[in-house]
Design a protein with these regions (language model features):
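Catalytic histidine-centered segment of alpha/beta-hydrolase-like enzymes
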Residues: 116-128
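Short beta-strand/loop motif that positions the catalytic acidic residue
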Residues: 77-79, 84-86, 90
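Short alpha-helix in the alpha/beta-hydrolase fold that links the catalytic acid
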Residues: 71, 80, 94-103
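Hydrolase active-site cap/lid region
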Residues: 13-64
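Gly/Ala-rich beta-loop-alpha elbow adjacent to hydrolase catalytic centers
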Residues: 3-7
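Catalytic histidine neighborhood in serine/cysteine hydrolases
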Residues: 102-119
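C-terminal alpha-helix
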Residues: 130-137
């Protein structure tokens, strides 16, 4: 399974919930749900209280803490090999997310790129080459 950005978070959560895959690759994945919501709210120039209300609504409706779905939290229950790829200059998702996810995985490899950002990373030849190698290993 391969996922980018929110897709990386989704993959880790799906694996935790018994998605059967042999390996996973996450690229530019976010981590902490509340941080992502706060960032969106800031970009949309909304009041910070909206993020709190959104979290409270989610937790009441689904009867689960939103942080349960954070990538680093899901990673704690993932045992398959995971390749984490992130750019140190990603302005959409800070590279600290990759390090935090990596620290919580049991079987991971971390590839940090330079000057590819959040989107160019997807078409980079070296990134694609490493993904193919990882899948074949």
């Amino acid at each position: 399974a391969i996922g980018h950005s929110l897709g990386g978070m989704s993959i880790l959560n799906a694996i935790r919930e018994n998605l059967k895959v042999k390996k996973a690759v996450i690229i530019g994945s976010g981590d902490i749900i509340q941080d992502i919501i706060d960032d969106f709210i800031k970009k949309l120039k909304l009041k910070p209280e909206i993020g709190i209300k959104l979290r409270d609504h989610f937790e009441k409706k689904y009867e689960v803490k939103m942080n349960y779905y954070s990538a680093s939290n899901a990673a704690k229950e993932v045992s398959i090999p995971v390749l984490i790829i992130h750019d140190e200059n990603d302005v959409d998702v800070n590279v600290k997310a990759a390090h935090n996810i990596n620290e919580n995985l049991k079987n991971s490899e971390l590839m940090i790129t330079k000057n590819l950002g959040h989107r160019k990373i997807l078409g980079n030849t070296e990134v694609i080459k490493r993904i193919v190698e990882f899948i074949k290993e």
